[in-house]
């Protein structure tokens, strides 16, 4: 029994010291609900979370948030977690990353974003991650990697981009990744990749490019030569078999087996119909730039600025599909539509459509004129139909001026001639009217005009038959007056006008003018 007492004492002491052992950390206080927390690790996976839960201990170094429904990562949601080194956000529903979302995690070494719904990456999405070593972006919906996307990751060693929909990798997309050792671009939609895109990767040791629809043309000639010369060491035996998908004559052939003479390109040709168009104020306009070539050219619209004070200005690219007169132009494969909405005089001027592929570049100008007044909308002709020039040439301005001097010389001359012609016509009409009035004044009035002849023919009312007989030899009508009323006012003999009626009217009486008489029949 004496030996058993110390043994029991040691067992009790061991149970008291067991929570203090480093292998079994105690449960931390302040752990988010339903999460499991340890001294430096917090597990919140598969809890149907929609946001990062509050209350995570500030000293957390490893955070598991996988298999949830987090769709938005706000900029300040991770701000208290400055000590974080491993963050697992895979299999969520993230659609975008705000600029500076990880600014407060300068010690982060590993970031897992696999299996989300990211469609694009902003240039400042990874600002602050100066110590990041591994970045998982596989299994998203990325389609383009723009220039300087990973510029703020100088110590990144592994970049996993497989199983996306990447079809465009810009020349400076991987700029700044001087420490990158592994790049996985397999199972994407890449048709080509430029030599300039891989130049910043001075520490690259593993490159995965398989299962992409490679277009074997002149733009990919460098890749075959690079693999044969020194890039072979970066590729596994599987990755060396880069299979062509285009053109059809080279389909399913390995790039390394295709001769350099078969990797050809067709320079682009470009056409805009009509080359000049007249638009009205306030209307919308769509202009198609048809480009052809192999590979399919990339099309960009630019507005050629008017020089000021003899100094040419830089060209402004236009967004294909978006209105405006500046900004960054977007590339469009083939359709090449220029969209202008609510046209003003500032839209007038010269535009340029540029098509480019690995075989070269081609440009074509387009001239836009704007009517000063609103008119009925004009429709552009169908690009497939024969070219027709726009109808109607009203006062047009190529700049913002509304002055008469802004018009062309031919337009000014036409307006001046029209005004002079109208003035001459008005003078001729006035002269003709005056001449006719003078002729009317000179013509004498016919004899007997304005004279009323009265005949005392009946002693009473007359019939219509008698009225037909009351006409003199010259056809004048003879009217019958009432004898019961005086015929004339009393007129002095010296005031009576002298009048000799014509022959055949001796029995008639001439009534004085400006005197009213009552005549009964």
UniProtKB/Swiss-Prot annotation:
Pfam families: Ig_3 (PF13927), LRR_8 (PF13855). GO terms for biological process: positive regulation of synapse assembly. It comes from the Eukaryota. Residues 306-330, 374-395 are annotated as: Disordered. Glycans are attached at residues 91, 342, 371. Residues 268-371 form the Ig-like C2-type domain. This is Leucine-rich repeat-containing protein 24. It comes from Mus musculus (Mouse). The gene is Lrrc24.
């Amino acid at each position: 029994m004496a030996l058993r007492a110390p043994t029991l004492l040691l067992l009790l002491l061991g149970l008291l010291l067991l929570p203090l052992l480093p292998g079994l950390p105690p449960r931390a206080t302040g752990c988010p609900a339903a999460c499991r927390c340890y001294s430096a690790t917090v597990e919140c996976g598969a809890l149907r979370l929609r946001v990062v839960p509050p209350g995570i201990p500030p000293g957390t170094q490893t955070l598991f948030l996988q298999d949830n429904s987090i769709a938005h990562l706000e900029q300040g949601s991770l701000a208290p977690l400055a000590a974080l080194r491993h963050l697992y956000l895979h299999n969520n529903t993230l659609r975008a990353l705000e600029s500076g979302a990880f600014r407060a995690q300068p010690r982060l070494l590993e970031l897992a974003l696999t299996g989300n719904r990211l469609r694009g990456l902003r240039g400042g999405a990874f600002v602050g991650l100066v110590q990041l070593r591994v970045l998982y972006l596989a299994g998203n919906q990325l389609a383009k990697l723009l220039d300087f996307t990973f510029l703020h990751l100088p110590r990144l060693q592994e970049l996993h981009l497989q199983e996306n929909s990447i079809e465009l990798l810009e020349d400076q997309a991987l700029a700044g990744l001087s420490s990158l050792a592994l790049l996985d671009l397999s199972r994407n939609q890449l048709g080509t990749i430029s030599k300039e895109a891989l130049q910043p990767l001075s520490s690259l040791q593993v490159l995965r490019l398989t299962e992409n629809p490679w277009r074997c043309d002149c733009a990919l000639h460098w890749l075959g030569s690079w693999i044969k010369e020194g890039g072979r060491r970066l590729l596994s035996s599987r990755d060396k078999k880069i299979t062509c998908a285009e053109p059809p004559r080279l389909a399913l052939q390995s790039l390394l087996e295709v001769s350099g003479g078969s990797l050809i390109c067709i320079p682009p040709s470009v056409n805009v119909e009509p080359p000049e168009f007249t638009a009205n104020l306030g209307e919308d306009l769509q202009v198609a730039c048809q480009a052809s070539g192999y590979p399919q050219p990339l099309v960009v619209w630019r507005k050629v600025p008017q020089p000021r004070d003899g100094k040419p200005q830089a060209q402004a690219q236009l967004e294909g599909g978006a209105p405006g007169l500046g900004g960054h132009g977007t590339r469009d494969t083939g359709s090449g539509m220029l969209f202008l909405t609510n046209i003003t005089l500032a839209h007038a001027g010269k535009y340029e459509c540029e098509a480019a592929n690995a075989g070269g570049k081609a440009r074509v100008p387009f001239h836009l004129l704007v009517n000063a007044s609103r008119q009925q909308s004009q429709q552009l002709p169908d690009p497939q139909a024969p070219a027709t020039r726009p109808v109607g040439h009203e006062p047009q301005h190529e700049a913002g001026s509304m002055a008469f001097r802004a018009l062309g010389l031919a337009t000014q001359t036409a307006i001046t001639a029209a005004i002079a012609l109208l003035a001459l016509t008005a003078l001729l009409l006035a002269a003709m009217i005056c001449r006719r009035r003078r002729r009317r004044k000179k013509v004498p009035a016919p004899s007997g005009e304005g004279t009323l002849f009265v005949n005392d023919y009946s002693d009473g009312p007359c019939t219509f038959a008698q009225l037909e007989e009351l006409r003199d030899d010259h056809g004048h009508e003879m009217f019958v007056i009432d004898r019961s009323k005086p015929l004339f006012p009393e007129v002095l003999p010296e005031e009576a006008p002298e009048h000799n009626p014509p022959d055949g009217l001796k029995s008639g009486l001439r009534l004085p003018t400006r005197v009213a008489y009552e005549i009964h029949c």
